[in-house]
UniProtKB/Swiss-Prot annotation:
Enzyme class per UniProt: transferase
Oligomer and partners: Homotetramer.
N6-acetyllysine modifications at: 103
Matching CDD domains: PRTases_typeI (cd06223)
SUPFAM superfamilies found in the cross-reference section: PRTase-like (SSF53271)
Binding locations of Mg(2+): 194
Catalytic activity line of the entry: IMP + diphosphate = hypoxanthine + 5-phospho-alpha-D-ribose 1-diphosphate; GMP + diphosphate = guanine + 5-phospho-alpha-D-ribose 1-diphosphate
Gene name for this UniProt entry: Hprt1
Active site positions: 138 (proton acceptor)
Protein name, entry field: Hypoxanthine-guanine phosphoribosyltransferase
UniProt binding sites for GMP: 69, 134-142, 166, 186-188, 194
EC numbers for this chain: 2.4.2.8
Length: 214
């Protein structure tokens, strides 16, 4: 029986890194508190996750399903590593991609209202190994909604990879199969994670400041 892969656990008292140690766009400096996960660490961890995914799912056609918008950077980098492994393997498998968008956030609080945008034609998932790629799992309600939708199409297997999982009292207890980092309950931005569409262009995962939320 498959088990969920371990993650890098970042403690509640993790101080992070001073902004001036990294290249941060000037227009964001006042809006950020600290760098929480540097880009290089994200990439190294993503490379390992790709190996875990291929070990678990690499025996059958994979459909990689990206959760937009926040998941696109992690999705692209994870797939690059998976494709590299696939190219250099004695037994390569076909891989296709699809996209879906879920809306559950308003400002820095989860509203509890989840809207599924797209996914009108997910019949291609039938009989396939489906890898859902998400940027962050907060309460877990959003992912549970998506999983119930995907399973209606009778895939052979469904696994979820998320770059981040928050430790929060609001969690419904859901945990993905592949997790990059388990983090404290802080509002983070960067590496395509946004705050009202800002900060997606940051390379690092950073903690937003109160000024940034204003």
């Amino acid at each position: 029986m498959a088990t969920r892969s371990p993650s890098v656990v970042i403690s509640d008292d993790e101080p992070g890194y001073d902004l001036d140690l990294f290249c941060i766009p000037n227009h964001y400096v006042e809006d950020l508190e600290k760098v929480f996960i540097p880009h290089g660490l994200i990439m190294d961890r993503t490379e390992r996750l790709a190996r875990d995914v291929m070990k678990e799912m690499g025996g059958h056609h994979i459909v990689a399903l990206c959760v937009l918008k926040g998941g696109y950077k992690f999705f692209a980098d994870l797939l690059d590593y998976i494709k590299a492994l696939n190219r250099n393997s004695d037994r390569s498998i076909p891989m296709t991609v699809d996209f879906i968008r879920l809306k559950s956030y308003c400002n820095d609080q989860s509203t509890g209202d989840i809207k599924v945008i797209g996914g009108d034609d997910l019949s291609t998932l039938t009989g396939k190994n489906v890898l859902i790629v998400e940027d962050i799992i907060d309460t877990g309600k959003t992912m549970q909604t998506l999983l119930s939708l995907v399973k209606q199409y009778s895939p052979k297997m469904v696994k979820v990879a998320s770059l981040l999982v928050k430790r929060t009292s609001r969690s419904v207890g859901y945990r993905p199969d592949f997790v990059g980092f388990e983090i404290p309950d802080k509002f983070v931005v960067g590496y395509a994670l946004d705050y009202n569409e800002y900060f997606r262009d940051l390379n690092h995962v950073c903690v937003i400041s109160e000024t940034g939320k204003a």
